[in-house]
C-alpha cells in the first residue's frame, strides 16, 4: 500500500505484486479521507505480510505532511508540533502498521539533515551563502523558479549574482 502525499492531494494506492510479470497490479486507488474506503484497501491493510510506503513529493509543506500522516489509520501516536519548513526530506519511507507518527517525522528530519550536510560539504567555493539553512532557502527558491533540471544552474547563477551585488 502506497500513500502518496502530494502538493494538491493525498492518495492511497493498493497494489499487489504479480509473480508472473514481476510488476505491481493496482487493486484500488482513492483519496485519503474519502467517504467510502474500498474493500480492497481494508482487506489488504489487515494482512500480515503487507508493506506500507509513504511517498512525499517535493514542494509539500511540513503542515501537509503532518496533516496527511495524522489521517493514516496504520500509524499511531501524536505527530506533535508541525516541524519548521524545509526540515523534512521529500522521499519515500517504508513504515509498518502501528509505527509512531512522531518517530516517522524524526526519520524525515534526520534524512533532511543528512541531505543538507552533504549539499553543504559539496557546495561550490566562493558562494555568498553563509549557512546550510541559507543554502536550503536558495535551493527552494531556485526549485520554485524552474522545475527543469537543465535550467537550475542558470537560475542559480542569476540569484548568486544578485546576492553578490547586494
Predicted regions and their residues:
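Conserved catalytic or metal-liganding residues and their short signature motifs at active sites
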Residues: 1-166
